[in-house]
Amino acid sequence: MGAKKNNNFVYFFGNKKADGKGSMKEVLGGKGAGLAEMTEIGINVPPGFTISTAVCGIFYENKKSIPAEIIDEITKNIIKLESSTKKGFGDSKNPLLVSVRSGAMFSMPGMMDTILNLGLNDKTVQGIIKKTNNPRFAWDSYRRFIQMFSDVVLKVNKDIFEDKLESIKKKKNVKHDVDLDENALKSLVQEYKKIVKNKTGKNFPQNPSDQLFKAINAVFLSWNNQRAIFYRKQYDIPSEIGTAVNVQSMVFGNMGDDCGTGVGFTRDPLSGEKELFAEYLLNAQGEDVVAGIRTPKNIKTMQRELRKVHSQIENTAKILEKHFRDMQDFEFTIENEKLYLLQTRSGKRSGIAAAKIACDMVKETLISKDEAVLRVEPEHLEQFLFPIFNPDDKKKFEILTKGLAASPGAASGKVALDAQTAVELSKKGERVI
């Protein structure tokens, strides 16, 4: 089914129908285009809507505010989302919670802002408790929301919240966030609200509509944060293209041990082998995987822990590759052993992987030989010339730590923990990692 025509600024997706489509990256951004396309091909995607990149330009032209007519259009799509999910935004008995995420035409991982669990307040948290009979989950979601919203929108330093979290974990003698019980998390919510009051002079906002539009504004503002500007300069991404904003109904990976979150590739991005390459955490939300709160598990472990979900991921990976005709990088959430996809895009890969994937996809009749040649880019070939560790020498040294490769080859230099420090060290002639 093709996307229906839409001359407006907001594009809805859900229930196997989408206003947009995968070819509309300039309008929907990469994330929004992927969500629309996955919805159309029957992948299990939580419903939502994408505010187009054009609105980002209008936002800046309009003195960093969204015009009334676009606010009306967003409000209409919230009503549509309520109908689709059979939940109410701000409803105290059956509340709709949403995520608000950026999504430019070109991938800019981690450069802009995300807010999860939006719509929670002192009343809706009680509705979640009654509906799920899971108070620990409700308070965990609320404390996460307060921290994210306060950091991104209210500009309260997230380290203050982290320090309070660590203090409570120490007091309760637990190592991980997931080990805190409902009473500890409820207490943490009250402490977080005190921090907000102390730092801003105002109570934490309780009106879901107010929360939503402040979050959307914050995502547009994050298009011009220091990280995003630096990234665009590094990768020659034009600043005028703007970012889209994706507002999507929440699915929860932090409801218990049959829930979780993860990221993965449909093939190994390092070797190109045709096998799932992914990691996940149980009883967690999306940011936990990349934040290093706990060490994620290899996808192979899921065959033992959640065999049914592992099978769903394998089947979904096949559908994605068959449709997009390329190796995909995807993000997922598991809620009560049901798989939901939150993002897909063509995955970055090493030179070796690019060559192998291209050749294998020709054999699988997914792409032609001519396409395969174009899939191996000049920089992929250059990677074959990069220095690597001598396998024999590696045996002589003690390994301090391991991780997933962010770039090909081997390198040595001073460690810089942020972009600005890396630039300053580089200007001094230092070799920097």
Feature names for model-found ranges:
Residues L400, P408, S412-D418:
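Short, flexible, surface-exposed loop segments at domain boundaries
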